[in-house]
């Protein structure tokens, strides 16, 4: 029973998959900015938009060991492009860890499946 409660919900998985794609898009954009102008500061608009994605990922991963390493970007002391890439890199690593923990190959599901509270034995995805 306790193990099932620590599994993500089906809603968490759906949201996670959407946020994972958004995170990759942000990473690719910020990587380009960091290559061209690593020390240039982000503006408040970018920080707010990036934090909107990061905060939702952080919420899904609040019970994971990686949570303590997931910081939001500081809106007051605007981070540089290279600082942003470091933070996003930590989220990307946490996403890989999360996926490897709860997503697996299942013969029964004939493909990849998620362990969730509603489907502790796995749900095809």
Give the residues covered by each predicted segment:
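Acidic-enriched, low-complexity/disordered segments with a strong bias for Aspartate over Glutamate
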Residues: 10-12, 39, 67, 71-76, ...
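Amphipathic alpha-helical interaction modules
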Residues: 28-72
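Amphipathic alpha-helical binding modules
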Residues: 76-125
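Short terminal alpha-helical segments
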Residues: 1-43
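Generic structural concept
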Residues: 10-13, 17-27, 47-54, 58, ...
């Amino acid at each position: 029973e306790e193990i099932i409660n620590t599994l993500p919900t089906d809603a968490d998985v759906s949201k996670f998959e959407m946020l994972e794609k958004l995170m990759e898009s942000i990473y690719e954009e910020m990587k380009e900015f960091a290559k061209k102008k690593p020390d240039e500061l982000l503006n408040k608009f970018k920080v707010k938009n990036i934090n909107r994605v990061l905060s939702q990922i952080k919420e899904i991963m609040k019970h994971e060991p990686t949570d303590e390493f997931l910081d939001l970007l500081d809106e007051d002391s605007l981070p540089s492009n290279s600082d942003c890439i470091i933070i996003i890199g930590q989220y990307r690593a946490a996403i890989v860890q999360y996926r490897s923990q709860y997503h697996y190959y299942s013969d029964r599901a004939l493909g990849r499946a998620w362990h969730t509270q509603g489907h502790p034995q796995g749900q095809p995805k």
